[in-house]
Amino acid sequence: MGRIIGIDLGTTNSCVAVLDGDKARVLENAEGDRTTPSIIAYTADETLVGQSAKRQAVTNPTNTVFAIKRLIGRRFKDDEVQRDVDIMPFKIISADNGDAWVEAQGRKMAPPQISAEILKKMKKTAEDFLGEEVTEAVITVPAYFNDSQRQATKDAGRIAGLEVKRIINEPTAAALAYGIDKKQGDNIVAVYDLGGGTFDISIIEIDSVDGEQTFEVLATNGDTHLGGEDFDNRMIKYLADEFKKEQGLDLRNDPLAMQRLKEAAEKAKIELSSTTQTEVNLPYITADATGPKHLVVKITRAKLESLVEDLIKRSLEPLKVALADADLSVSDINEVILVGGQTRMPKVREEVSAFFGKELRQDVNPDEAVAIGAAVQAGVLSGDVKDVLLLDVTPLSLGIETMGSVMTKLIEKNTTIPTKASQTFSTADDNQSAVTIHVLQGERKQSSGNKSLGQFNLEGIEAAPRGMPQIEVAFDIDADGILHVSATDKKTGKAQNITIKASSGLSDEEVEAMVRDAEAHADEDAKFEELVQARNQADGMVHGTKKQIEEAGEALPADEKEKIEAAMANVETAVKGNDKEAIEKSTQELMEASAKLMEIAQAKAQAQQGQPEGEAKAAKQDDDVVDAEFEEVKDDKK
């Protein structure tokens, strides 16, 4: 059995970890970084992921996709999506089924398909480290993700060629990372997770009894559309407004300028965590008839705090709800752990510390804790980590729509999963032969105020007066927090059951098509990499040969030189094309044509080998000069 890896699929950055011995280890990607920007760029020739995508974002803003996690499992008409439509430089569109999709380079793509590119990069990072193929993973999601968003994340894993063994909530993963090596007794921990695009709070009890650790989630709450991106957007708006005030030009109409502004705003926000004032300086940000314009704005930490004050306050409301749901008060919390890059902001730390009335833990890396926890959970599933029991909860209530458009709950929020629940319902009309089971997720009494997860029909009910037929509806939530529903007519035994797919979401056929597409692209990517290597080798050969011709000078016969130059011209022509075999063939021919040149170069090198040695001896005899000093004398001063 292969290794199961742990992946933190983040809004802004992603991270992968694996169990190395008895410790989880965060892996460095090909660029040497422990986290990878969750950015994907589409060009005419290739798909870029991570740092390479981020670097070219300024020149390719409409085809560079970031914060895709904010769209995963969402409908285009959702208020949160509509807010992003107005501010994102890339195009967010409505799919045929009403989902929010993205259009780049003329291709329409589902968020799971785009997220899969990041997961593929994480998979490759792990494979490079382990030296073996990886096919299984534990992937983290915000605790407050609904069923559709969890399903979409599993779909992304499948498209990336990963079997998702478990979906685990991010705060729970962070608690695992924090508590796994602390074997003290009972401890109630609050995990405040403010990431790039989502916010969660989880209250978790860590018990240690007879060597076994139990991590039990008592309550969870959050906001899946609150995070560092929102903080950045406040800064971007402020800078754009200041520029408009000063220059009379609105940068919002210029995608290139807005991309530069986004990068500068993010950088300034980060700087203001360690300094009290910074300057945003963007020369040549735009131009008008009078010439180029430059943006220069000084911003203080106090100004930034005033811009985002309401966002920080917004994150405190779910804390109150989670404590109430867990039936605890602030004084019952033993430790407070901060997770997510945005928690580095001093004002966030200050407000959270004031809310709980205690010092915050400083020994948890906010960027890596979630991936480490995912790797620990992967170890639990593979049997490498023993004596750890994880009891997570469903974040939102689940139920069905009943008469009068009322939501009747079958499973209350914060119920430990996996779990089952059933209830008996009846018909609303005489002689009704079918019922529609409309599955909902949320806390509102009115059906329309909740998230519709899907619906199905139970047909063939025997004719009877209303209220007589007995229809049992059973809900079953698995360990990933994904719902399976069945409805059974107790009299006839007729049953209908489904795994809830979002009323939108991708069908199995669509996911399979995307898996095939990803596999095809993997072959393409491998071929492209081989082509680039062949080109690089050819370029290096031409460069080296030219240098050797210069060094050989008159020693190289004219006919040999002509032959080599013709071979070099062939290589230079081949490199411009896309035929790897042609490039390799011309490189080989150049190598053969350069045989005489190699002989001359070797003879020259051998002739020169004895020379410096003799000179050095003479120098030693003539003068007692230290070697290092001798080497530092410049030729023109000898």
From Swiss-Prot:
Residues 601-638 are annotated as: Disordered. The modification Phosphothreonine is found at T198. The keyword Chaperone applies. Residues 614-623 have a biased composition (Basic and acidic residues). InterPro entries: ATPase_NBD, Chaperone_DnaK, Heat_shock_70_CS, HSP70_C_sf, HSP70_peptide-bd_sf, Hsp_70_fam. It holds the Pfam family HSP70. Residues 624-638 have a biased composition (Acidic residues). Induction: By stress conditions e.g. heat shock. It comes from the Bacteria. Keywords: ATP-binding, Chaperone, Nucleotide-binding, Phosphoprotein, Stress response. This is Chaperone protein DnaK. It comes from Shewanella pealeana (strain ATCC 700345 / ANG-SQ1). The gene is dnaK.
